[in-house]
């Protein structure tokens, strides 16, 4: 039945069954496929955080390719329910209408988020029953924030007016709020961050099959838990052992700290093929994984270990990890290199290491006994994704922008980073924080070593070319592969695990010259373009690298303007290194003086060692 304008009920209304099924609708809605329609009903006092959490959850789920829409109480009263007041009858009708609309969104395959005080239990029960009758999931989410905290927030000044008697029937003051008896989830938003609340709801949706595991923003560390450590230490002594290289150990560190979440260890063949052919992991949703993380094995080790349910990995004689349920498969080196690098020329240094490695690969679940350390004076900078998340929370960062680098920082880089922060502030972010994240794994011989780079970066911070109060400097443990646009996706994906939501990409990222022709292996613009299209990276906003050059008029690095070409001088990396080797001084404003001094000192030391 339906109401007519004269107040009579329409009796000639028949419910029509649609031709398109939910399963079929789910195939074309969103990026992940599958029907995910449901309603998450946020309820709680005014100022509890319902809308804030709902909007943040909507932003997160959409970034993961999951169609989501947030219905907010104030917004709905501007349109659909603008003819309703705040009497008990009008409040009931307000919630009834919203319940029906939410059900339609959910039936359309959308995750519908509703944020309404909805103080009465019977109204919330009605919303639930409407969904249950339609066979749609309904999750009641009680945002349980104490009244005193809500009053302290009082952004709209409503509590103050209610206390003064200017608003009658205000929930929590002179009208009772009926707390849910058994909500699917209870969020204590008074003492938890918005991000923590969002992830609790995401975990609930994942457990109920609405959200795939790959969309849960949890870092999967592969360390043996404290409770099982003694048993693992006793077990590893009796296991067959395989000695691994320093490069392999760096990949153990990457995996164990959760940079490659959701991988549970070195790739088995199924994961390897997905990475090689699709640039993604596809089980449980789409996760970008453009580079294979694999463990090469020589034939003698394969023959010795095949059939074992587990074996130990040892580096420099120390057993560091257990590989369980191993799977051996052929290492097709030329094909791997051709797909990953666009060349199988052994003059490319990482290709050379692959070609010299074992003829087999082994995948399996990794259990790492303790954190990988290198005792080189830099371990304090090797922060895990979880540690970086904690650091950003402590800084109250509301945006994190990451800058990947393997070279010394000059003032052109610094200009880009400070300009990015300025633009984020203009967009409304209160405290954007820079993750200055130099790559700390293997690099080719002619790159500046990590220890010298870290000293140079610290000098940049000490001279306040970059603001140290809004910068976190840490080491990214991955080896460098020089695989261009393929590798830059890995660099971006790994930073997502830290909570970074912006990523600065430069010209020719992860590029190098062809070992024979000396021409660039990759188009210098393709890395930035690929990142804007890559599957599984929609959570990350890409900040393209604007060209910076030395402005002779300003005696400073500046964004290049082709209309003022004669004012600019380009100082390439090759030219910069040549000047440092010769002990020359660059133009004033090109690099912080103390940072340049470190560059000169490095090349002087290198020359003496040679």
Curated annotation (Swiss-Prot):
Which key words tag this protein in UniProt?
A: ATP-binding, Kinase, Multifunctional enzyme, Nucleotide-binding, Nucleotidyltransferase, Transferase
Catalytic activity line of the entry: sulfate + ATP + H(+) = adenosine 5'-phosphosulfate + diphosphate; adenosine 5'-phosphosulfate + ATP = 3'-phosphoadenylyl sulfate + ADP + H(+)
Q: Provide the GO MF annotations for this entry.
A: adenylylsulfate kinase activity; ATP binding; nucleotidyltransferase activity; sulfate adenylyltransferase (ATP) activity
The record's top EC class is transferase
Q: Which stretches does the entry tag as region Sulfate adenylyltransferase?
A: 206-610
The Gene Ontology biological process annotation of the record reads: 3'-phosphoadenosine 5'-phosphosulfate biosynthetic process; sulfate assimilation
Q: Where expressed (tissues)?
A: In adults expressed in coelomocytes, body wall and gut.
Q: Where is this region: Adenylyl-sulfate kinase?
A: 1-205
Its Enzyme Commission number?
A: 2.7.7.4, 2.7.1.25
Report the active site residues: 118 (phosphoserine intermediate)
- Name the residue ranges of motif: PP-motif: 506-510
Enumerate the residues binding ATP: 44-51
Q: In which pathway does it act?
A: Sulfur metabolism; sulfate assimilation
Give the protein's biological function: Bifunctional enzyme with both ATP sulfurylase and adenosine 5'-phosphosulfate (APS) kinase activity, which mediates two steps in the sulfate activation pathway. The first step is the transfer of a sulfate group to ATP to yield APS, and the second step is the transfer of a phosphate group from ATP to APS yielding 3'-phosphoadenylylsulfate (PAPS: activated sulfate donor used by sulfotransferase).
Q: Which family does it belong to?
A: In the N-terminal section; belongs to the APS kinase family. In the C-terminal section; belongs to the sulfate adenylyltransferase family.
The protein's name: Bifunctional 3'-phosphoadenosine 5'-phosphosulfate synthase
Native source organism of the sequence: Urechis caupo (Innkeeper worm)
